[in-house]
């Protein structure tokens, strides 16, 4: 099975971020989620044995995307195909008891989002440390400040770094707050009542206890208590808008660098062998700044699109303003 490379992943993302959203790793994450539920269901008295759990654990990393794709062509259902594949590998049929597809996929997506945001928080902190070094290094490097893009008053290059750092720190505070309160969806079933889970476990109390255990296992402090088949898409909007906010400081600073580079005030530098143009190899383009601004443009577009997601009518009841789950 061939996978078309994602341009953003190959040009922008770190290896850690690519691995987090890799299709194989996502399937492994789903399997870990199933196994976690299996163990909790066994504790609750469901007919699941240690041998059943062990059978699944032994094959958790055996992911064959081509085989799953073949199953999906028959079932015409992505989650059912992955269930059948995992059952076939383990030689058992114990996973997904009392669950609907979104009990799996919505929680996994929130886990991925949380982990991705944690990576961005880590890189943002690293960026702040680098900015601090340059603030000190260039605190007495004087230059002409500009207003309306014309010469104004004297400032320093260190001040430019400090302004970027101040905005990034403010944005990072908002990101940190979002990460801390980001919830799991929980095991709410097709319409949000958790009826299948209650029926299999015996009571609402037992289901709530299981949801709390799952949240703890995957590092979440919160689980949504009243939700439909999907978690509120306003959460997605908030996540994307926070990403745009994080990108704002680097993008603003990158724009300043490009403007200053155009008048010869600063330069990103020029590595050995680097060229600025196939026709004019001497050109010293602000390549990194251009890439930063390119990502910011994309994030502005994604934020605009995310505005259309945060109305969440009951799935499959009427036309939705987002891609349908079967797509």
Give the residues covered by each predicted segment.
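A helix-coil-helix interface module used to build multimeric assemblies
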Residues: 1-194, 206-213, 276-277, 287-293
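Long, amphipathic alpha-helical stalk/connector segments used for oligomerization, subunit docking
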Residues: 301-312
């Amino acid at each position: 099975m061939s996978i078309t490379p994602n341009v953003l992943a190959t040009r922008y993302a770190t290896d850690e971020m690519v691995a987090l959203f890799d299709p194989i790793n996502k399937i492994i994450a789903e399997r870990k989620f199933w196994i976690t539920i299996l163990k909790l269901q066994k504790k609750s008295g469901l007919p699941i044995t240690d041998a059943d759990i062990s059978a699944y654990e032994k094959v958790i990393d055996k992911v064959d995307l081509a085989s799953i794709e073949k199953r999906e062509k028959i079932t015409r259902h992505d989650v059912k195909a992955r269930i059948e594949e995992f059952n076939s590998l383990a030689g058992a049929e114990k996973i997904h008891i009392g669950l609907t597809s979104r009990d799996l996929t919505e929680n996994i997506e929130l886990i991925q989002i949380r982990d991705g945001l944690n990576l961005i928080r880590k890189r943002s902190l690293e960026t702040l440390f680098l900015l601090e070094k340059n603030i000190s290094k260039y605190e007495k490097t004087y230059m002409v400040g500009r207003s309306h893009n014309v010469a104004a008053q004297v400032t320093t290059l260190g001040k430019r770094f400090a302004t970027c750092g101040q905005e990034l720190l403010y944005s990072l505070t908002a990101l940190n707050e979002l990460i801390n309160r980001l919830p799991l969806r929980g095991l709410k079933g097709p319409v949000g009542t958790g009826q299948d889970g209650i029926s299999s476990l015996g009571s609402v109390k037992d289901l709530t206890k299981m949801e709390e255990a799952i949240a703890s296992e995957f590092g979440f402090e919160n689980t949504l208590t009243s939700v439909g088949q999907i978690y509120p898409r306003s959460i997605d909007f908030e996540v994307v808008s926070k990403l745009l906010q994080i990108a704002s400081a680097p993008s603003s600073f990158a724009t300043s660098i490009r403007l200053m580079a155009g008048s010869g005030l600063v330069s990103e530098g020029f590595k050995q062998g680097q060229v600025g143009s196939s026709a004019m190899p001497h050109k010293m383009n602000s390549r990194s700044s251009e890439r930063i601004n390119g990502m910011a443009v994309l994030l502005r577009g994604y934020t605009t699109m995310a505005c259309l997601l945060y109305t969440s009518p009951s799935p499959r009841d009427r036309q939705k303003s987002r891609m349908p789950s079967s797509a």
